Amino acid sequence: MSDIVLEFATDLKTILGQNLSKIILYGSYARMDYDASSDVDLMVLVTLSDEEIKKVENQVFDCAFELEMKYGVDISPIIKNERHYEYWVDTLPFYRNIQKEGVVVA
């Protein structure tokens, strides 16, 4: 699994460059209670606006799909503006959960 995450992180650095702030692994892989049907959940935090995210999200999803085909494991990236995430992290249960259980991988 670490190979997938590292390869995905490397690809994202190429796609997003300095706009990539952080990649957080969360969910069953972060908790270490995954099984064969588990996907790799990743929160991708960027310094891009929502409009700019829409322009690059297909590249990110294509990258995830290529790695899914290579490794046979589903990758589920969510791309959010870092400021948006930080603003809501103490309010929204989903973001609180990522903050609590997540592992920063890049």
Task: Kindly label every feature range from the protein language model.
Residues 41-45:
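Short beta-strand->loop micro-motif that forms the acidic, two-metal-ion catalytic signature
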Residues 21-29:
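Short gly/ser-rich loop at a beta-strand->alpha-helix junction or flexible surface loop bordering the NTP-binding
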Residues 1-19, 31-36, 47-106:
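Catalytic core of pol beta-like nucleotidyltransferases
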